[in-house]
Design a protein with these regions (language model features):
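Residue-level signal for beta-strand positions within conserved beta-sheet cores that form or flank
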Residues: 2, 31-33, 83
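N-terminal beta1-alpha1 ligand-phosphate binding loop
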Residues: 3-25
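A structural signal for isolated positions on well-ordered beta-strands in alpha/beta enzyme cores
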Residues: 5, 34-36, 88, 121
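Short acidic/polar alpha-helix capping motifs at helix-coil junctions
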Residues: 8, 38-41, 73-76
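Short, surface-exposed acidic/glycine-rich loop or hinge patches that mediate macromolecular interfaces
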Residues: 9-13, 42, 60
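FMN-binding flavodoxin-like domain, especially the glycine-rich phosphate-binding loop
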Residues: 29, 50-173
Length: 173
């Protein structure tokens, strides 16, 4: 049975709620896939390294800051050899209040994962957003799913519902 490590960090609970939706949808689409929902707080590299399929959820705080638990996890993350591992990212941000830093956190971590041999999946269009800049953006695409529940919460479920089947297909699951 395939398993996915779904790691997230949260301070307000918003990223956790999205992670729970992601897990629920995966299990609805592919009941034979085990999804382990894991908060990143006080985790070690080995907790993440055991998975071949990873979905990582991160909010971006203020002026492009990483959520505290993800900031602390950087040394652990840098110790992981992602060769052969498949990763997809989702991020939460505010495209208006912090337009110059929209969903930067997933860009920072996606770059590290790719530089450490990981394969990224789940790129999404950046064209339906009104931000100025994002470290998560490459040309007209984000390196994952960017969600703005502050300003576009009405689009969140539809975006997740479109993204998850694409990620599972891209993962080969």
């Amino acid at each position: 049975m395939a398993s996915i490590g779904l790691f997230y960090g949260t301070d307000t609970g918003n990223t956790e709620q999205v992670a729970e939706k992601v897990k629920s949808l995966i299990q609805e689409i592919k009941p034979d896939i085990r999804v382990d929902l894991i908060e990143i707080y006080q985790r070690k590299a080995a907790d993440m390294a055991q998975y071949d399929f990873l979905i990582i959820g991160q909010p971006t705080w203020y002026d492009g800051e990483l959520q505290g638990d993800w900031e602390e996890f950087i040394p652990e993350f840098e110790a992981i050899d992602f060769t052969g591992k498949q990763l997809a990212f989702f991020g939460l941000g505010d495209q208006y209040g912090y337009a110059a830093y929209f969903c930067d956190a997933i860009g920072v971590y996606a770059d590290m994962a790719e530089n450490q041999g990981g394969t990224l999946h789940g790129f999404t269009s950046a064209l339906d957003y009104e931000h100025d800049f994002s470290k998560a953006q490459r040309a007209d695409q984000f390196v994952g799913l960017c969600l703005d529940i502050d300003n576009q919460d009405d689009l969140t479920d539809a975006r997740i519902n479109q993204w998850i089947p694409e990620v599972l297909t891209s993962f080969g699951l």
